[in-house]
Structures are given as C-alpha cells and as structure tokens.
C-alpha cells in the first residue's frame, strides 16, 4: 500500500516547508493528503536529467509524464535546494555516512546471481536530504508545541571511552585528527 505507482492514489502526510535562499526553513505546513504520482521516475533517469541540463525528463513505462516541462522545472528547483541544504548540513557538522551498500542481482528463481556496490548519486541524496528536512520539521513542531513524543537521546560519551577512541585514532596514518573534543571548529570536528 505504500509503494508509489503512476496514477494510483495513496494516502500520505504532507510536510510542506518553505526555505529561504540560504536554506533556512520557514514555518512548515502539515496535512493528510491523497497523493497521485504522474509517472514513474527512477534514480538513474533523474540523475541523467541533472547531468544533462536542457533535456526533458522522461518517465518509464506506459504512463508518460503529463507535463515534462513542469516536472523538469520542479526537479531543477529541487536539485538546487538539495545542494543548499547539503551545504548547510555539512556546515552544521553532521556526518555523511557515504558507505557502499550492496545491490544484489537475482535469477528468475530468486537465487542471488551477483552483488555489487549500489550507486549513490545526487538523485538519491536529494531524497535523503528532503526526508531529513521533513523529519527535523516534525521534531521541531512536536518539541515547540510541547506534544509528547518518543525520541532517541544519545547520552554524552564516557570520558574513558573517548580517551581510548582518540588514542586509537592517533595510532592511524590519518592526518589532522583532533586530539580531543573540540567545541568549535570544522564540521568534521563538530561531529566528534
């Protein structure tokens, strides 16, 4: 019931967030909606569109996009916003676990025939960035509205464990590692 298929109606929750030109979020709007996609786009097609400005976006399958120009403009705007949000998030010192994930190939009988690293391009990262923005908007709304909700709290790390971590890091050949906790500094330092 949650998968998107062209022209199929699906229940969803809308999180609409206005952003300024610097990537700062405005007041979000939340609403239950019925969503109907116009066509099937896959990550590779969207990435091809990003890599080839001026070309029309094409959908796969039997349901062509109703308005490829409108979708192309929306995707172009979304790509620009993604780049701003990614820059802002990096400046905040968040980690980007850009680790390879396996992608399996299957035979008709369901047996695995191969495995390779899955590609992670801007089309993938755009969706991830927008999901993070939606999650943050919901968390801010629940917190400022004093609505009780469950969330995960990460306690401060134990000093002895941090000392062991920094000793291990210093034993590596990696350059420019912090020697201890840094309150202000580069984004990667803030992550520690």
What are these regions (language model features)?
Residues 1-192:
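Electropositive polyanion-binding surfaces
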